[in-house]
């Protein structure tokens, strides 16, 4: 299998993106642009079908880059509930944009974050009113050290994890959880 590497200490370059499968439909992220997001103040990366390898020294933004993708899939950070913490310290707001290529269509997700903890989400240029309307556009599963709680903690933690993953594939499931 072909792969390319990407050093996150550079501002912009071309890399390969992992091919994702969901219910027989393939998808991959073609492009991601970040502006005013955590320590990745401004970057655009064009992705191609294949495998991603992101590398760099500590505190270069590898986890922040993956978190930005997760936010586009779920509408939420995996590390904080306070969206203002996602904004670069000297920026008034943050913007995340991803272009997704799917078997039958292309989608674009825009996330705008403001210091007042205001968030705007648009799919293909259309603002969404409910978080559940985002689900199904981009699929992402992230495992972090905190996910060891899936094994250590009780069944409630495992249910929460599975609920969030299923919500990405079925917005109706999300609304039924409410």
Residue ranges and their predicted role:
Residues 66, 157-158:
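Short coil-to-helix segment of the ABC ATPase nucleotide-binding domain corresponding to the Q-loop/switch region
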Residues 73-149, 155-157, 163-169, 173:
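Nucleotide-state sensing region of NTPase/ATPase domains
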Residues 38, 158-159:
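Short, cationic motifs built from Arg/Lys/His that form the positively charged side of catalytic pockets
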Residues 23-71:
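Pre-Walker A-like glycine/lysine-rich segment at the N-terminus of P-loop NTPase domains
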Residues 174-178:
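Extended, charged coiled-coil helical stalks used as long, distance-spanning scaffolds
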